[in-house]
């Protein structure tokens, strides 16, 4: 049997046939087109996108097995710079890839002695010292240079990208990863993430722009963004006061609050799960990135537990539990008996079986991993993100709001996503402003996914968010190559080009000089026939934004304003008449394309032509990265040259970058 067959068989033997089928689909969609015909002389970058905690690792392992069947023998599996996650990944690889040689960070001798007898997987943290060490290790062997590396970068948007792209130099991790690729004559570098925003906005020149993108859908039973963060608040979200997190720690006599309700919710949920035969139930508290606040919240939870233990016989305490039990029954009708649950909780407390674990950089590896059995309350910050999984996580108290929120970072902290949860007993406690942010992120995530599925390899993905919410950290984006456009701003070309004025005349002949509601697809067809002599206005970019809206809603409408016989000078600093500007501004939530046909006087050499002015929906910021070349050239022409000219990393011209509030 092949490596892939063995892997799939092991999954089926565990009773997970649906997962096996999903992995087979991913493999059959990717391997024949991109792995089987690998040239063994190029360096190819690809992107595998899956929802947060949706089973990306299983699909990664499936693709690695399929690659081994195609002749790849040297694999590097990268994790974020987190001991817990690296060890979690290493142990899982040992278990799931039992016919591979699995190497830890200190297993160089094991790797060399294996000498390609089995496919080898080296599991490494993205740590500068570790990566440099393994770059030297790989270079020192006599079998790596002539055989391609298959590098799988889990959470590739974290640490791997060049954080100094705007300083004409290269960050340490990014440089080390590039040098690891250089240890061999060819490689496949598979970026894997649930938050691809920063990767989608990379340039081709950077070497991290994926040639192809694949999205795999989560399996049955997955609870993700659409479950927790639809446009309207679902019953699984419990809204807390926006300032509660600060007030709780500052006021020792703080009355009944969301944290206390969340704790009792966890206790009752745990009682139901454990009395129903379960082995674990977890409660996650994410208050801040500050470790002193982690300690403060852990102590506050301890105080609440002591209060319950001292007063459990009092009617007021039992009534408080009963009120929360009744709220849980609104979504979980078949709960265990209340009195039985209450007795179980008190027994667990009396016997000190409820664990409070603080997970942060000051905790040891052993302290950070004791949450797979029993009733656990986990408190932490950054250690709770990026790939660390918590079994049977049913209750979350999330109150961290960044001053300048980034969509990808926030989404990675959404540890409530996953499979092994009881959906009817899920509860997430958060303030309204956090729910709104998560809901906005979820909407854009769905639009990104639809673009990936609809586009040719997902090469031209457009991203937009409400003002104040950024897609990612700015230090990994080449500011000269990422277009930033503001909703509500009018954009038009100084020097417009009509590719085919007769075709434009024909399309627009059905419209008088007036305003019309039209399908956005018509606006994209008009944009196909327009351009600019210079790089001040890019029709493809605006078309890309509109296509992202159509991906969400194929019948989406926009406004088309037609004006003819306009006598406007070439290169004018303004285009719209005051009345048309006012008219367009009335439609704040729609795309507005105003198109003027000029007489040809005043610098146009007597030639009539159409001039477009486009306004994107307001209160949002739109981001455009650099698409892969689409000129019909073969794939091999667009592999990445690893001899990067670092003096020119940030000098590629922008298609158009404007983030102001005025016309140009």
Residue positions per predicted region:
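Motif I (Walker A/P-loop) of helicase-class P-loop NTPases
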Residues: 56-65
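Conserved Walker A/P-loop ATP-binding site and its immediately adjacent core
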Residues: 59, 72-96, 289
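Conserved C-terminal RecA-like helicase domain
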Residues: 90, 99-101, 148-151, 276-377, ...
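Conserved RecA-like ASCE ATPase "motif II neighborhood" in helicase/translocase motors
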Residues: 105-152, 160-180, 380-381
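Conserved P-loop NTPase catalytic core
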Residues: 117-119, 147-153, 165-273, 282-284, ...
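C-terminal catalytic or substrate-handling cores of phosphate/nucleotide-
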Residues: 256-282, 287-292, 447-552, 556
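Conserved RecA-like P-loop NTPase helicase motor core
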Residues: 359-436
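C-terminal accessory/interaction regions of large nucleic acid-associated machines
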Residues: 401-425, 540-664
């Amino acid at each position: 049997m092949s490596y892939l067959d063995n892997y799939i068989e092991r999954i089926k033997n565990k009773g997970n046939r649906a997962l096996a089928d999903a992995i087979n689909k991913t493999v059959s969609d990717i391997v024949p087109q991109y792995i089987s015909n690998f040239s063994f002389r190029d360096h190819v970058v690809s992107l595998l996108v899956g929802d947060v905690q949706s089973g990306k690792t299983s699909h990664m392992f499936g693709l690695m097995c399929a690659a081994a069947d195609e002749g790849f023998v040297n694999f590097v599996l990268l994790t974020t710079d987190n001991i817990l996650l690296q060890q979690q990944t290493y142990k899982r690889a040992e278990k799931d890839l039992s016919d591979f040689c699995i190497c830890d960070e200190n297993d160089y001798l094991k790797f060399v002695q294996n000498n390609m007898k089995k496919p080898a997987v080296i599991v490494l943290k993205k740590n500068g010292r570790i990566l440099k060490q393994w770059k030297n290790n790989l270079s020192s062997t006599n079998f790596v240079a002539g055989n391609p590396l298959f590098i799988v970068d889990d959470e590739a948007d974290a640490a791997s990208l060049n954080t100094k792209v705007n300083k004409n130099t290269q960050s340490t991790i990014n440089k080390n990863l590039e040098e690891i690729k250089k240890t061999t004559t060819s490689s496949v570098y598979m970026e894997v993430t649930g938050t691809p925003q920063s990767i989608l906005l990379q340039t081709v020149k950077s070497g991290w722009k994926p040639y192809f993108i694949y999205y795999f859908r989560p399996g049955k039973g997955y609870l993700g963004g659409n479950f927790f963060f639809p446009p309207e608040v679902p019953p699984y979200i419990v809204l807390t006061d926006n300032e509660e997190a600060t007030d709780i720690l500052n006021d020792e006599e703080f009355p009944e609050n969301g944290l206390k309700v969340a704790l009792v919710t966890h206790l009752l949920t745990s009682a139901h799960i454990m009395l129903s035969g379960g082995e674990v139930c977890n409660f996650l508290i994410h208050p801040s990135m500050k470790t002193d606040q982690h300690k403060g919240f852990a102590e506050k939870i301890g105080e609440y537990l002591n209060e319950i233990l001292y007063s459990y016989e009092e009617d007021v305490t039992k009534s408080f539990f009963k009120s929360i039990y009744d709220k849980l029954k609104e979504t979980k009708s078949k709960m265990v008996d209340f009195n039985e649950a209450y007795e179980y909780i008190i027994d667990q407390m009396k016997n000190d079986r409820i664990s409070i674990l603080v997970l942060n950089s000051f905790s040891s590896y052993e302290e950070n991993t004791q949450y797979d059995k029993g009733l656990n309350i986990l408190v932490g910050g950054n250690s709770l993100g990026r790939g660390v999984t918590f079994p049977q996580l049913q209750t979350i108290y999330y109150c961290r709001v960044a001053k300048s929120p980034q969509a990808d970072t926030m989404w990675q902290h959404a540890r409530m996503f996953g499979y092994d949860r009881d959906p009817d007993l899920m509860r997430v406690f958060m303030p309204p402003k956090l729910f709104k942010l998560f809901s906005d992120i979820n909407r854009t995530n769905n639009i990104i996914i639809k673009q990936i599925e609809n586009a040719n390899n997902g090469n031209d993905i457009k991203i937009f968010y409400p003002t104040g919410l950024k897609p990612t950290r700015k230090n990994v984006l080449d500011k000269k190559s990422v277009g930033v456009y503001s909703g509500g701003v009018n954009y038009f070309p100084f020097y417009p080009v009509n590719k085919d004025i007769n075709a434009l005349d024909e399309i627009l002949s059905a419209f008088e000089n007036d305003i019309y509601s039209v399908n956005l697809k018509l606006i994209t067809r008009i944009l196909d026939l327009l351009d600019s002599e210079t790089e001040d206005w890019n029709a493809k970019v605006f078309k890309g934004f509109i296509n992202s809206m159509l991906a969400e809603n194929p019948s989406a409408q926009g406004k088309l304003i037609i004006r003819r016989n306009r006598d406007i000078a070439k290169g004018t600093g303004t285009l719209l008449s005051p009345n048309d500007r006012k008219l367009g501004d009335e439609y704040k939530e729609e795309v507005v394309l105003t198109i003027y046909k000029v007489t040809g006087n005043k610098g146009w050499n007597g030639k009539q032509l159409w001039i477009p002015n486009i306004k994107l929906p307001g209160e949002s910021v739109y981001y455009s990265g650099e698409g892969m070349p689409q000129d019909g050239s073969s794939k091999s022409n667009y592999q990445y040259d690893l001899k990067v000219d670092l003096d020119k990393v940030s000098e590629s011209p922008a298609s158009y970058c404007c983030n102001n509030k005025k016309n140009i």
